[in-house]
Amino acid sequence: MPLSRWLRSVGVFLLPAPYWAPRERWLGSLRRPSLVHGYPVLAWHSARCWCQAWTEEPRALCSSLRMNGDQNSDVYAQEKQDFVQHFSQIVRVLTEDEMGHPEIGDAIARLKEVLEYNAIGGKYNRGLTVVVAFRELVEPRKQDADSLQRAWTVGWCVELLQAFFLVADDIMDSSLTRRGQICWYQKPGVGLDAINDANLLEACIYRLLKLYCREQPYYLNLIELFLQSSYQTEIGQTLDLLTAPQGNVDLVRFTEKRYKSIVKYKTAFYSFYLPIAAAMYMAGIDGEKEHANAKKILLEMGEFFQIQDDYLDLFGDPSVTGKIGTDIQDNKCSWLVVQCLQRATPEQYQILKENYGQKEAEKVARVKALYEELDLPAVFLQYEEDSYSHIMALIEQYAAPLPPAVFLGLARKIYKRRK
């Protein structure tokens, strides 16, 4: 009988370790106790695996993953201080041109203002995910000061990409506030000059990658990853705009299939796959299978995240979310309107048709009342539970050979979020 089958017969289930995993990590090193906490471990160096024993079926892994996710949920908080402190170095490096080229001094001053207004003030989840995943995937002895600086910098590149998208998106959506302050384009003296400012934010990504990573073997992979993520997100934004053109409310366009396509391209690739994939490349993990498996988990997380965002746009507290939602006024193909269309009676459909995509406050309120009449908040809460369980199952199935903690920290970070 093969060893793996015998182990399963006695209630021991195997998960592959990361490629670099040292013996002490498989055995539950104090540096990574959560991977094996509470369970007996069987490991041997040549097998490249760590094991957890249960007396129950493999389904127990799902509850174990929830527990380990809880234990790791503060890892983002642990990394946040160093990550945020690195921003001053990012700004300094990006504005050094002023000293060598005084003729562009006022443009560099504008760049500094753009960076400091638009790149900070968020939750930093995307950037921190790069750092957290890097620490999980890279051998501890290789996490020296230089490599950590590169990880922080790549994390900030993800945050700059996010800032670039948000500045442009706020203009297109006529948004009022972002991260608890007025949108950049709404500031006196900015206006549509914000379009160029958004382009500056994007250009900074590639300057930083060149300055910090050009001597690294993964440099080209990172360049291609950021370019591909930008393209995918902009395709998603195009789908979003085409589905809901201004002044033309067509509810027939708002199908679940269309919604999933928008979410996949506009949100999931850059918000979830990009940061984990960047850390994987930095750890030397560039195999197609490993990236494909990670993508299966992360794109599902991205859909989960965007549906939360759509719900919070209307039912969230602006003092908590930091923004005033405008999806109804902007005629957006959101999860709420898709769910409404699936449940509405002919009379309710007519109410939606007459009020959706309109700016008047009373019409917005009528749509919200319709959503509440259809009990969509309860539908969302049930979706949130079901989707989280599905994500846990995907982690169980596809995480290997990466440690599940790479995905669990991110999943726990967004589960039950309210901003």
From Swiss-Prot:
Dimethylallyl diphosphate binds at residues 178, 266-267, 306, 323, 332. Its cofactor is Mg(2+). Pathway: Isoprenoid biosynthesis; farnesyl diphosphate biosynthesis; farnesyl diphosphate from geranyl diphosphate and isopentenyl diphosphate: step 1/1; Isoprenoid biosynthesis; geranyl diphosphate biosynthesis; geranyl diphosphate from dimethylallyl diphosphate and isopentenyl diphosphate: step 1/1. The record marks 164-165 as: Important for determining product chain length. SUPFAM superfamilies: Terpenoid synthases. Key enzyme in isoprenoid biosynthesis which catalyzes the formation of farnesyl diphosphate (FPP), a precursor for several classes of essential metabolites including sterols, dolichols, carotenoids, and ubiquinones. FPP also serves as substrate for protein farnesylation and geranylgeranylation. Catalyzes the sequential condensation of isopentenyl pyrophosphate with the allylic pyrophosphates, dimethylallyl pyrophosphate, and then with the resultant geranylpyrophosphate to the ultimate product farnesyl pyrophosphate. This is Farnesyl pyrophosphate synthase. It comes from Homo sapiens (Human). The lineage of its organism: Eukaryota, Metazoa, Chordata, Craniata, Vertebrata.
